[in-house]
Amino acid sequence: MNTIRGLVLDERTLAPKLGSGVGGLSGPVLRPVALAAVFAAYRATGLPIVGVGGVETGAHGLELIAAGASAFALGTVLFADPEAPVRVREELEREASARGFATPLAAYAAAHGGPPPTPLRRVA
């Protein structure tokens, strides 16, 4: 989940603030949408997924891993915090350990409560 379409109106004129009208909404507001997308994609396919959308902390990354992402990426947070990758990695390790996981990837698909589904196979 990179962005979803959004619209912001000028409070005074009630005209769109962007010349094109709509733009991309990103950041923390996307996290629940990204989690739902990863959860559904994992359940449907079992294929490797890179979770993207609203990750600002290690706890957020661990949520995506638990939902079925085998990796996650940072986006909007980098504008405000260029050091976020280092911080998030450290937080991720602490969050996993605090929840009893030996490593962050040990939490992989924990939200699904069972073994990974069989990935879809290509039909010739």
Q: Over which residues does each language-model region extend?
A:
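Glycine-rich beta-to-alpha transition loops that act as phosphate-gripper elements at the mouths
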Residues: 31, 47-59
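Glycine-rich phosphate-binding active-site loops on the catalytic face of alpha/beta enzymes
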Residues: 1-7, 54-55, 59-88
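Short, well-ordered coil/turn segments that N-cap beta-strands
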Residues: 45-49, 69-70
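Contiguous, function-dense segments enriched for cysteine-driven chemistry
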Residues: 37, 69-72, 76, 119-122
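Extended, intrinsically disordered, low-complexity segments
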Residues: 31, 86, 90-124
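C-terminal helical cap(s) of enzyme catalytic domains, especially alpha/beta-barrels
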Residues: 9-23, 65, 77-102
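Glycine/Thr-rich beta-alpha phosphate-binding loop at enzyme active sites
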Residues: 1-47
